[in-house]
């Protein structure tokens, strides 16, 4: 079983796995890119959220400073909002429902 598969089923896995590191690096780069896009440019920011997260509902709003482990394990519902400097550790699945503000 590959390390990423172990991670996905909640089993012990090696943090130094190249595939996991690649996903983490992509998440870091996307979080940095999101921070460079104006908070007023909703469409571009939403496109980036959709690249970062496993699934995204309607009308997501994430203030600057957002960070996560992998991104792909985060699933957010409609009307999701985070305030500044939020970190979600998603080495396991994180599901956030509709109308949630953090």
Which residue ranges define each predicted feature?
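Terminal amphipathic alpha-helical/low-complexity segments used for targeting or macromolecular assembly
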Residues: 1-59
């Amino acid at each position: 079983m590959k390390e990423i598969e172990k991670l996905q089923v909640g089993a012990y896995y090696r943090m130094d796995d190249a595939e996991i590191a690649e996903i983490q690096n992509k998440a870091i780069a996307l979080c940095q890119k999101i921070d460079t896009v104006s908070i007023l440019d909703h469409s571009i920011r939403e496109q980036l959220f959709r690249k970062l997260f496993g699934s995204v509902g309607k009308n997501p709003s994430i203030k600057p400073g957002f960070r996560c482990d992998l991104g792909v394990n985060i699933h957010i519902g409609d009307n999701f909002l985070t305030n500044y400097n939020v970190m979600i550790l998603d080495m396991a699945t994180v599901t956030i429902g509709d109308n949630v503000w953090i």
